[in-house]
Amino acid sequence: MSALHTLSLAAIRDALARREVRAEDAVLDCLARIETTEPRIDALLHLRAEAAIEEARALDAAGPDASRPLWGVPVTVKDALTTAGTPTTAGSRILEDFVPFYDAFAVQRLREAGAIILGKNNMDEFAMGSSTENSAYKPTRNPWDTARVPGGSSGGSAASVAAGQCFASLGTDTGGSIRQPASLCGCVGLKPTYGRVSRFGLIAYGSSLDQIGPMTRTVEDAAIVMGVIAGHDKRDSTCADRPVEDFAAALASRHDLAGVRIGVPAEFWGEGLSPEVATSCRAALDAARDLGATIVDVALPHTPQSIAAYYIVASAEASSNLARYDGVRYGKRAHAPEDLMDLYVRSRSEGLGDEVQRRIMLGTYVLSSGYYDAYYRKAAQVRRRILEDYRNAFATCDVICGPVSPVTAWPLGALTADPLQMYLMDVFTLSLNLAGLPGLSLPVGLGTESGMPVGIQLLGRSFDEATLLSVGNVLSRALPPLGSPAGLR
């Protein structure tokens, strides 16, 4: 069987289980694909080639195990998740020497399920960015056009999946960082409900916003990975102790969209939305209607305020989370400091990038005496209103649908000098994180002008990923496939 990297995760899993393919063959095929594509897209920071081959050989020697749903499947992981024995930098110079001795919960679950981790993906530093240009090491490029961004902050994961370097990747989503790069790179991305997946081992950005989720080439593949990584973990006090649904069974139970009410918020379809994105997303809604869905209007009136609220809340949490990286106990230490204050200042100034420093300063400011009520408390109040908006909307619909990004992937460097414009790229994704609800991004076509992927997002009720996945699976199967990335042909 040739070109294994073109298969879906479900297909390679089944081939491995039937011993039509060896785990070593799957790993070697992905490594060959990495060798071919990596110089053009820079999606990886760390590669575990030799270790992955050894792990594959050990699996082959033991034979397939039906109790391990990802047996022999090569995957990658965003570099914000700790991996025992493999560097974990979060895309930052301040952590370039950090090699953890433990796995993140989600990584542990992957290994227990039989997955083989090929490497760690590039990302915006500490997940702060929308283009993966804020990585301290290198920018990642979009496989569909290597002169354009892949999105962020999980841009390395999205690029790896789209390029066929792996069959799935784990990303993180604090304000759209799974859904937006998935949209820009033409793959599927699932942001679970807050608390569905343990954050143990995740290098934190915004602790009340961060979630870990799968990035894959099909909705079915996302359901498979989601079934592996979801579950309670006592090491994360915010992780929900509740049963995990059989997501694969949920997909199998739905064959059309009859009876499904899809809410369309006007706030997602107004000013700033490019015509080519609007055209592709409306065509997807038409397809949903043809499949039996009922399209209803809903309102999310506080969407315009979500950007300000998000950057206040997220920056405040980041300033607290990143305070530990001072060169004393955590983080790379500046060379030959003159005194303790010089150690603090130089370690953080040399180790942290401009965008991270900008958000730390903003977060420290909004939490400072005299400004807390004016900024942070108001942002928290807006956050509550946003959750109420979603609850009111779900009283009349089952899922909410809208564009993921207002535009398709933009040229590298086009927005780096304008942070505010970069922040606006997340206008449709931020509110979901503030509400803690699940969202699924799936590709719906190529832009009529740019020729780049366009994604649509389905937003759901708390802990109702099963509905999102089943609806998304039916819809995605009715849409024409994107084909292989044009930038790598």
From Swiss-Prot:
Molecular function via GO: ATP binding; glutaminyl-tRNA synthase (glutamine-hydrolyzing) activity
GO cellular component: glutamyl-tRNA(Gln) amidotransferase complex
Catalytic reactions on record: L-glutamyl-tRNA(Gln) + L-glutamine + ATP + H2O = L-glutaminyl-tRNA(Gln) + L-glutamate + ADP + phosphate + H(+)
EC number: 6.3.5.7
Biological process, per Gene Ontology: translation
Disulfide bonds: none
PROSITE patterns hit by this protein: AMIDASES
Residues at the active site: K78, S153, S177
Alphabetical list of InterPro entries matching this protein: Amidase, Amidase_CS, Amidase_dom, AS_sf, GatA
UniProt keyword annotations, A-Z: ATP-binding, Ligase, Nucleotide-binding, Protein biosynthesis
Superkingdom of source: Bacteria
Role noted for this protein: Allows the formation of correctly charged Gln-tRNA(Gln) through the transamidation of misacylated Glu-tRNA(Gln) in organisms which lack glutaminyl-tRNA synthetase. The reaction takes place in the presence of glutamine and ATP through an activated gamma-phospho-Glu-tRNA(Gln).
Family according to the record: Belongs to the amidase family. GatA subfamily.
PANTHER family: GLUTAMYL-TRNA(GLN) AMIDOTRANSFERASE SUBUNIT A, TRANSAMIDASE
Subunit structure as annotated in this protein's UniProt entry: Heterotrimer of A, B and C subunits.
HAMAP family given in the database record: GatA
Protein name: Glutamyl-tRNA(Gln) amidotransferase subunit A
Organism: Nitratidesulfovibrio vulgaris (strain DP4) (Desulfovibrio vulgaris)
Lineage, opening ranks: Bacteria, Pseudomonadati, Thermodesulfobacteriota, Desulfovibrionia, Desulfovibrionales
Gene: gatA
